Every structure is written in structure tokens, then in C-alpha cells.
């Protein structure tokens, strides 16, 4: 499908007006009749459930958000969310109770949970590309770490972000095959020992900046963290499946412990960052690649299973920094969202029906977590 390429003499306002007045054909849409039929069936069922219940009864129905990895293509995530906000007419992030992020998706989630707006995050990314991405790889890790610390706090812990529930992915690469590890801002309502046994490993002592470094340490782009943690996108670039499993695990744990609390997913919004251009792998990195190829989960399979807002035509390198290239990428997002306006409106309708997350925060708080003893943060 041909893209609208902004002409030099056209103003941004005229370009948007032109886009609003276009007629979009079915051939221009991202369409799969089997997946769309399934999505429509689930959507109609959930709308029916929400219409039958009153506001109090809806308190256990939640919205969850999944944000893909992709380096500078975090700007794709922010632009997509801005376009959804344009339809919503209000802030989007406060509708979500549980958010999963990989790599740049973790950075976006952490920024929003810290109180930054989407526009502020876009300015952060523009500064990021100019300061962190130099002309050689791997890029300077010290500059990256300093940048994250200055933006989100050097002494802030992951647990200091109390709401929404956050789930960040990283890859533990000091084992073969490499293993997915999850970092959270919450624990299960049980003892420290049982939390550790079930994989909830000391996130309450983890600095936020270090959690983000672990999630975004893409091989050949940035060095590993503590000589073992690398980018979560190696195994789970789209963390939707991990997020779904996490919600189900929370329900199962509460059932096992006779805790009368469970949730039902009202809406899963999964936002991708486009496809990655193919690049030739240097011989020095072949052995590294062989370690990763054994992992069975790929982002593409997750997309097929779940369905997500995905900008297929965005093929920008993770460390791209050219202003023209970045501007075109963001314009492609705007065009894509206008083309799929009907889909966006359905998402907004479902989110509104479920409602904003603050009213459900008390529901989660009523199943209070076990409080650990004070400890020294992980530096």
C-alpha cells in the first residue's frame, strides 16, 4: 500500500485534513477474516457481559496492556497511543491495571507509570537518540545508564512505581539455553521464600534504572548487565503471552490459597513497533545467535495468536537517529491509525466499558502482598 509522503509545501494541518478526508478501501486494511471473526466474537461477548453488570460488579474485570521492544521505535508506541487518545479524548494509560513491556516497551511503561505524558516521552526519545546512539556498536553503556537515571531517578526502585502492575522481561544469558526472567513491581500474597520459589525474585530490591537496562540490553547494541542479563526481546519481544499467563497464574495462586479474588480480562491491547530490517550477522556473533535460536517463542507467533496493532510498513533500525527517517516513521503511524479507525474505536469502546483502573486498585489492594523486611537495593 503506498504511503502518504508529506510534501514540502504542505503544512501539518493540511496533511491531517487530507488524511481525514480520504476514503479507505478494504484492500488497504490489515484484514484476516478468520482472526477478525474471532476477535469480533470475543468483543461482542465481552460488551454483552459489561452491559449486564453494574459498575460495582465490573470491578474484577481489568484492562491489560502489552508494549513491544524495538529501540527508537518506542516512538511508534507513543504515537499509536496518542492516536488512540485522540479518539478517546482523554488519557489512555489510566485505563490499564496491568502492563507488560519488553525493552523500549518497558521504558515507555516506566515513564508513563512515573507520571510522564506521551508527548513528554516523545521528547525523551528524541534526546535519547541524539545522546546515546553514536556511529558505532555497541553503543556507550555508561551514557545510556546515566540518561535513564537522569530521566527516571537514580535511587528509585521498581517497587516505587506502585500502580499499575508492571511486568518487564529480560533474558538470563549465563545459562544454555537462555532463560526468560520477569521483573515485577508486585509480589504474591505469601512469604519471601515462596515468592522466590515461584519466580518472584527480589524485584522489591531492584533499582528501576537497572530493571530497564536489563530489559533493553540488546546484543551488539549494548553490553550485558552484570555479565548475564540481556534484552528481553531475545525471547519475548511481544510480552502479551507472558502477561496473559501472569494474570492466569495470579488467579490460580489465589484459588490455591483460598483467597476469594480473581480477575477477568476485559481488554488486551498489544502495541507493536513494526518489523525489523534483515541485517547480515558478522561471524563473531554467529555463536551468540545459535544460543538464542533454540528458544521456541517468537514475537511473530504471539502476534498471530493474539492480534495486535502492528505497523508492518515501519522498517526502521533500532538505533536509527536521522530526523527525516524518524519523522516519516511517526507519520506512518498516524496514517495507519486513520486507516484502521474502526478498530481503534472498538478498542476505545471496550476500554470505556471496563472503566479506568483507579477504581480497581482497591480491589487488588484488598489482597495485600506480604511485606518483606527492609533490604539493600540491587545496584
Where do the model's predicted regions map?
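Conserved catalytic cores and adjacent C-terminal regulatory segments
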Residues: 2-379
Amino acid at each position: 500500500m503506498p504511503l502518504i509522503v508529506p510534501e514540502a509545501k504542505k503544512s501539518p494541518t493540511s496533511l491531517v485534513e487530507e488524511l481525514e478526508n480520504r476514503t479507505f478501501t478494504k484492500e488497504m486494511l490489515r484484514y484476516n477474516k478468520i482472526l477478525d471473526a474471532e476477535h469480533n466474537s470475543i468483543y461482542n461477548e465481552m460488551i454483552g457481559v459489561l452491559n449486564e453488570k453494574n459498575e460495582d460488579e465490573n470491578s474484577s474485570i481489568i484492562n491489560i496492556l502489552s508494549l513491544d521492544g524495538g529501540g527508537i521505535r518506542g516512538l511508534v508506541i507513543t504515537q499509536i497511543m496518542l492516536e488512540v487518545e485522540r479518539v478517546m479524548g482523554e488519557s489512555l494509560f489510566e485505563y490499564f491495571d496491568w502492563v507488560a513491556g519488553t525493552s523500549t516497551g518497558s521504558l515507555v511503561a516506566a515513564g508513563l507509570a512515573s507520571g510522564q505524558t506521551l508527548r513528554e516521552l516523545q521528547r525523551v526519545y528524541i534526546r535519547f537518540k541524539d545522546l546515546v546512539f553514536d556511529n558505532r556498536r555497541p553503543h556507550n553503556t555508561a551514557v545510556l545508564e546515566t540518561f535513564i537515571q537522569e530521566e527516571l531517578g537514580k535511587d528509585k526502585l521498581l517497587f516505587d512505581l506502585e500502580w499499575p502492575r508492571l511486568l518487564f522481561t529480560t533474558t538470563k544469558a549465563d545459562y544454555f539455553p537462555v532463560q526468560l526472567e520477569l521483573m515485577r513491581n508486585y509480589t504474591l500474597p505469601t512469604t519471601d521464600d515462596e515468592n522466590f520459589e515461584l519466580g518472584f525474585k527480589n524485584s522489591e530490591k531492584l533499582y528501576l534504572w537497572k530493571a530497564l537496562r536489563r530489559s533493553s540490553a540488546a546484543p551488539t547494541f549494548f553490553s550485558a548487565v552484570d555479565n548475564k542479563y540481556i534484552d528481553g526481546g531475545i525471547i519475548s519481544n511481544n510480552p502479551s503471552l507472558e502477561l496473559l499467563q501472569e494474570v492466569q497464574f495470579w488467579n490460580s495462586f489465589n484459588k490455591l490459597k483460598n483467597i476469594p479474588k480473581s480477575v477477568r480480562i476485559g481488554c488486551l491491547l498489544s502495541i507493536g513497533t513494526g518489523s525489523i530490517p534483515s541485517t547480515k550477522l558478522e561471524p563473531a556473533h554467529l555463536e551468540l545467535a545459535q544460543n538464542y535460536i533454540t528458544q521456541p517463542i517468537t514475537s511473530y507467533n504471539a502476534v498471530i495468536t493474539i492480534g495486535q496493532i502492528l505497523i508492518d510498513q515501519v522498517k526502521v533500525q533500532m538505533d536509527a537517529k536521522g530526523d527525516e527517517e524518524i519523522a516519516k516513521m511517526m507519520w506512518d503511524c498516524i496514517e495507519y491509525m486513520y486507516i484502521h479507525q474502526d478498530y481503534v474505536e472498538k478498542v476505545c469502546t471496550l476500554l470505556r466499558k471496563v472503566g479506568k483502573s483507579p477504581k480497581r486498585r482497591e480491589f487488588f489492594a484488598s489482597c495485600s502482598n506480604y511485606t518483606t523486611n527492609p533490604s539493600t537495593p540491587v545496584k
